[in-house]
Amino acid sequence: MAEAKPRNLRIVMFPFMGQGHIIPFVALALRLEKIMIMNRANKTTISMINTPSNIPKIRSNLPPESSISLIELPFNSSDHGLPHDGENFDSLPYSLVISLLEASRSLREPFRDFMTKILKEEGQSSVIVIGDFFLGWIGKVCKEVGVYSVIFSASGAFGLGCYRSIWLNLPHKETKQDQFLLDDFPEAGEIEKTQLNSFMLEADGTDDWSVFMKKIIPGWSDFDGFLFNTVAEIDQMGLSYFRRITGVPVWPVGPVLKSPDKKVGSRSTEEAVKSWLDSKPDHSVVYVCFGSMNSILQTHMLELAMALESSEKNFIWVVRPPIGVEVKSEFDVKGYLPEGFEERITRSERGLLVKKWAPQVDILSHKATCVFLSHCGWNSILESLSHGVPLLGWPMAAEQFFNSILMEKHIGVSVEVARGKRCEIKCDDIVSKIKLVMEETEVGKEIRKKAREVKELVRRAMVDGVKGSSVIGLEEFLDQAMVKKVEN
């Protein structure tokens, strides 16, 4: 028999230290706060935990009226061989990402101390924890102190399922073939070795990444459930996989997207982008952006620039310095692009270059935008699908390759342009893919139609009145969390 629902609820959220994790956690926290304000029967408090330098980043993403409290756990990056500002994925080169992952395990005891403290303070309140999959030890700590806990994955279920299976089993090491099936996820289809990020491809079970993953992933079984930033109608295969291998509830609650943060970029950039888009015909623009952490080779930049110019399509390109060039301040794009490129596209008004950051949601929601050339990060995919914009995929790292597989092979809203940061890519190949999706080809018409259909599926998932699948998922999670009695 279920216990009576407690009157008060304390929600503790702990994202990993990276903007791609923090921002979805903030978006989920704000959604939960909104739900709890509407449900006045319970007094609810929400806290977010992180390290000292990440607390201001979280605070900057919260509206001033939010009552979400921020809790700082002690952490000194220099104690772990990291730069003094090395508390966030975004501030580190890829070579040091594993060092931050390993260092995060030092937060376990401070987290336990914090949980012990609030359990003494909260009395009869129900305390639940929402943790990050890179902080897999959270589940065990919560089980030991008697607190209900779930993982919130900012990644989709299909992508994370492939990621989990490969790290635990390293199936590509068992075959000389270029393609292989996943041991416990064969329904995902064949994976190609070129669809593995560099750390996976080089893994042998004794390398730093393998050792870390084999410590963290088994800890996922200590959690009482999973929340996924995804939509059941497009990610059922991945959700079913996690239900099968974990035996615990798995809830889709996406898309969990934060409203655009107007403080990130300058007002002049937003106005320039809007004015430029307003001047273009409907469905005529290619938007190119590879996320906040990814850069491409300078040779790739040259080929991409030539392709965008040769395609004769309008485009917005968010330009970052190429791989190997660390430029934290302003940089001159002319040094990395074909001679006269910026002047020609400015004169013709056919292209707009934006440095480092652009108002992505504003661009994707604009009627002039036709297709998104993306690194296939999950947040970018959700933003694109939410606005009915098909994709040109160029996956580069992490689970992005598997996201690309899902979008192209299983959903049909994407065409892969390139694969990885070291691939060979030619101007003509990019041009042909752009035209394939944007012009009146059979493939292009079908992909654009499918993207519009998926937009409607995503919209319905979040509709309150008719109880969309993600609305139901979040309600079921909260209902279970409120009555769950954790067995010690």
UniProtKB/Swiss-Prot annotation:
CDD domains: GT1_Gtf-like
InterPro entries according to UniProt: UDP_glucos_trans (IPR002213), UDP_glycos_trans_CS (IPR035595)
Pfam families: UDPGT
Record-listed E.C. numbers: 2.4.1.-
PROSITE patterns xrefs: UDPGT (PS00375)
Keywords: Glycosyltransferase, Transferase
Top-rank lineage group of the source organism: Eukaryota
Record has Transferase as a keyword: yes
Residues annotated for UDP-alpha-D-glucose binding in this entry: 292, 358-360, 375-383, 397-400
Record-level Gene Ontology MF annotations: glucosyltransferase activity; UDP-glycosyltransferase activity
Keyword Magnesium: no
Family: Belongs to the UDP-glycosyltransferase family.
Protein name: UDP-glycosyltransferase 92A1
Taxonomic source organism: Arabidopsis thaliana (Mouse-ear cress)
Gene designation per UniProt: UGT92A1
